[in-house]
């Protein structure tokens, strides 16, 4: 039995709260955000006496520590902004609480995300006897668990990994992002990167693409970009010769993005407007649709998986493991779209693994360092069934 504090009341925070409320292991849930009205709305939708709400500015470490201590939290699940990862980790250390997040740290003034800042907390968490589990959404998150499962059950060595992420849904908007617009646009407008033969290769943003066939969806144009799980996977699976990440974008989305970039609306530095300092990308976020608002009219599916190639018993082997998720089904269950759902469910499940002691070690860890079996045994029951194709077509032999 455990108490969990969830920080963040966006689309993902809502899913995490719904899923935690449905789990017997979580006896008390505190949903905290700068805008407490959002927390109250989510709590009302869940309708469980287990869920309480609170206002919190997560940048204020002392406020977070007090809230954690007053609540008696065993675990903090961070689904707020990546800018807040380090201050929330600091608060957990001070309050003596385990930590879980879904995205690695990113400094507000530089569009650059990497694990080094959080990995540097290893000794602090280990010495405190606390655990910090990093990147426990879907990608990063389930993709790392998928890869660990493949290594445990199907391969002696993994040589090639291509993570593929398709959203074939339709939300009816001319242009909108499926999660925080500021974070989303920063991610895809920076240089693409992939790891090959021990070296990081860099490409211009969205300059490499190919059609990839996704189950029950078909061919979709997929763009090579940098995604954070590549950094931890090449560290934790040193036999990898190449690791890449692909994501689908429609032509209309790319065109909108390029126009916004060309006119300066994706800038993250301050500009002066009518005597005030504003950041263009933050202003753009304010005028774009709130991602959670897309859920009601969303149709279609997502498909996220890992194409893996390596060696088992001296023989070459290919393996594909994936999940498809339906936007409308997610909305019917918890009132969210599938992007939020596929991130929030693994976060709640990762928290469950921690409080049950199945994933429990002192220090800072990525999900692929944990035993994948208990997590994947529960993932389908939690709403994200997964599928395998052994020695099927491998579309990346080029």
UniProtKB/Swiss-Prot annotation:
InterPro entries: NAD(P)-bd_dom_sf (IPR036291), Sacchrp_dh-like_C (IPR032095), Sacchrp_dh_NADP-bd (IPR005097). Disruption phenotype: Deletion of the gene leads to substantial accumulation of agmatine and lack of CAPA, aminopropylagmatine (APA) and spermidine. However, the knockout mutant shows a remarkable decrease in putrescine concentration compared with the wild-type strain. Its EC number is 1.5.1.55. Changing residue 227 to A: Loss of activity. Pathway: Amine and polyamine biosynthesis; spermidine biosynthesis. Changing residue 104 to Q: 210-fold decrease in catalytic efficiency. GO terms for biological process: spermidine biosynthetic process. Changing residue 343 to A: Strong decrease in activity. It is an enzyme of class 1 (oxidoreductase). The keyword Zinc-finger does not apply. Keywords: NADP, Oxidoreductase, Spermidine biosynthesis. The keyword Metal-binding does not apply. Changing residue 187 to A: Strong decrease in activity. It catalyses: N(1)-[(S)-3-amino-3-carboxypropyl]agmatine + NADP(+) + H2O = L-aspartate 4-semialdehyde + agmatine + NADPH + H(+). Dehydrogenase involved in the biosynthesis of spermidine via the carboxyaminopropylagmatine (CAPA) pathway. Catalyzes the reductive condensation of agmatine and L-aspartate-beta-semialdehyde (ASA) into CAPA. Shows activity toward putrescine and 1,3-diaminopropane, but the catalytic efficiency is three to four orders of magnitude lower than that for agmatine. Cannot use cadaverine or spermidine. Belongs to the saccharopine dehydrogenase family. This is Carboxyaminopropylagmatine dehydrogenase.
């Amino acid at each position: 039995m455990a108490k969990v504090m969830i920080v963040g009341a966006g689309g993902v925070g809502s899913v995490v709260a719904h899923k935690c409320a449905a789990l017997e292991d979580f006896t008390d849930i505190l949903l905290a955000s700068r805008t407490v009205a959002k927390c109250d709305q989510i709590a009302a939708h869940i309708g469980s006496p287990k869920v309480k709400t609170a206002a919190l500015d997560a940048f204020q470490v002392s406020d977070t520590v007090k809230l954690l201590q007053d609540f008696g939290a065993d675990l903090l699940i961070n689904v707020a902004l990546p800018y807040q990862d380090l201050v929330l980790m600091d608060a957990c250390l001070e309050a003596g609480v385990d930590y879980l997040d879904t995205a690695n740290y990113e400094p507000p003034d530089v569009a650059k995300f990497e694990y080094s800042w959080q990995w540097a907390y290893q000794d602090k968490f280990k010495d405190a006897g606390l655990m910090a589990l990093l990147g426990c959404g879907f990608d990063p998150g389930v993709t790392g668990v998928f890869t660990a499962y493949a290594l445990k059950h199907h391969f002696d060595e993994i040589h090639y990994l291509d993570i593929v992420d398709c959203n074939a849904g339709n939300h009816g908007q001319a242009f909108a992002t499926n999660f925080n617009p500021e974070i989303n646009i920063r991610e895809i407008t920076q240089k693409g990167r992939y790891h090959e033969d021990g070296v990081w290769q860099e490409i211009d943003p969205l300059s490499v693409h190919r059609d990839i066939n996704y189950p029950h969806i078909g061919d979709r144009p997929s763009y090579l970009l940098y995604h954070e799980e590549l950094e931890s996977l090449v560290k934790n699976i040193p036999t990898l010769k190449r690791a890449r990440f692909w994501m689908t974008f429609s032509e209309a989305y790319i065109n909108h993005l390029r126009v916004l970039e060309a006119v300066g609306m994706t800038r993250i530095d301050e500009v002066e407007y009518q005597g005030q300092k504003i950041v263009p990308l933050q202003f753009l976020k304010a005028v774009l649709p709130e991602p959670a608002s897309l859920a009601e009219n969303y149709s279609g599916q997502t498909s996220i998986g890992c194409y893996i190639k390596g060696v088992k018993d001296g023989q070459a082997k290919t393996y594909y493991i994936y999940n498809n998720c339906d936007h409308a089904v997610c909305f019917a269950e918890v009132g969210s779209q599938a992007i939020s759902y596929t991130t929030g469910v693994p976060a709640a499940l990762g928290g469950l693994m921690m409080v049950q002691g199945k994933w429990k070690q002192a220090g800072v860890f990525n999900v692929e360092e944990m035993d994948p079996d208990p997590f994947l045994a529960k993932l389908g029951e939690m709403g994200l069934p997964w599928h395998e194709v052994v020695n099927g077509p491998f579309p990346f032999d080029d």
